[in-house]
């Protein structure tokens, strides 16, 4: 690598070059990275403060519109979160706990990172709030055994911003009886924006323990990101094109975040994280912008309309769960 000086201009040039040569979505997103260099390069003056430099470099990285891109110093971290702004939230924790789950002491059970319950209509429910929360095979055995007599299963991953891909694979493996192609990954092979390896297939192996055979509804909103996006894709892949659909996604498009993140360092010791390896679904379509639901539900709009009509009961309903009940009762 070129050795850039540890000064504002050197740090700017190093960061620009790392993204230019190693970030994987410049072409897919249609970003003119040379123009970005010109725009921000003229703001970086010798002798500017660390704080000002951090602001300029963060703004430059925001041009990538990628939630996996962060700049970190010892005191600050930049984070792009506009990918979910402008979408309905589609999740209300108060409604979920007050009218569906109840309390931990009397309403739902907890096993590791999973909250679970059997509703009165005999539909099972699992809430998983973060793929960073560990889930072992013993936990999954216990939960699926408890839910085994249910007519169908809801897996609620709304607001789950991701975490560990191992957990995504471990859970998805409970929903297939055979090794299944879930997608493809590519790796950068050179500094050019299109220097990628061939697409390498990714397979999901079935768990050799308890597996769920009935219908499943995944509840998603735009804040489902990274490992959650991966999980939703894996679950979609288990639907067989020539068989009746078994796994449904209800709610909104997920947030994406399919690029495998990688980290590098600037001369001043700041760290930059960025998407390095693109991930595709089993049809070789990009997953970076998120996964469309089978059934779109805008809960925010339904709640607003309920208030307008003076319908108090409507304010106790989670529209995504209610839609899932309909699908699983068919």
Protein language model features and the residues they cover:
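C-terminal "post-core" interaction segments
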Residues: 1, 5, 9-13, 123-125, ...
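Flexible, low-complexity junctional segments that flank or bridge functional domains
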Residues: 1-187, 194-198, 215, 243, ...
């Amino acid at each position: 690598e070129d050795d850039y000086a540890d000064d504002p201009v050197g740090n700017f040039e190093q960061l620009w070059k790392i993204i230019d040569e190693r970030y994987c979505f410049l072409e897919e997103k249609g970003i003119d990275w040379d123009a970005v260099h010109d725009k921000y390069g003229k703001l970086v003056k010798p002798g500017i403060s660390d704080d000002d430099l951090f602001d300029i470099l963060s703004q430059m990285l925001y041009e990538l519109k990628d939630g996996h891109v962060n700049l970190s110093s010892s005191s600050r971290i930049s984070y792009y979160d506009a990918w979910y702004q402008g979408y309905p939230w589609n999740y209300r924790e108060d409604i979920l706990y007050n009218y569906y789950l109840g309390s931990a002491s009397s309403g739902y059970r907890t096993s590791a990172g999973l909250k679970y319950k059997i509703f009165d209509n005999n539909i099972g429910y699992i809430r998983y709030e973060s793929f960073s929360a560990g889930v072992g095979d013993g936990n999954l055995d216990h939960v699926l055994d408890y839910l085994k007599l249910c007519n169908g299963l809801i897996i609620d991953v709304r607001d789950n911003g991701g975490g560990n891909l191992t957990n995504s694979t471990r859970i998805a493996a409970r929903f297939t009886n055979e090794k299944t192609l879930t997608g493809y990954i590519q790796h950068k092979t050179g500094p050019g924006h299109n220097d990628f390896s061939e697409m390498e297939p990714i397979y999901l192996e079935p768990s050799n323990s308890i597996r769920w055979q009935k219908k499943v509804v995944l509840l998603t909103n735009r804040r489902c990101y990274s490992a959650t996006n991966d999980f939703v894709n894996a679950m979609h892949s288990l639907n067989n094109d020539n068989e009746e659909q078994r796994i449904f996604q209800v709610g909104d498009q997920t947030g994406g975040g399919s690029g495998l993140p990688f980290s590098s360092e600037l001369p001043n010791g700041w760290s930059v994280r960025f998407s390095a390896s693109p991930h595709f679904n089993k049809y070789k379509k990009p997953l970076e912008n998120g996964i469309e639901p089978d059934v779109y539900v805008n809960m925010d709009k339904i709640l607003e309309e309920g208030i307008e009509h003076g319908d108090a009961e409507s304010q106790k309903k989670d529209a995504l769960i209610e839609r899932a009940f309909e699908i699983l009762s068919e």
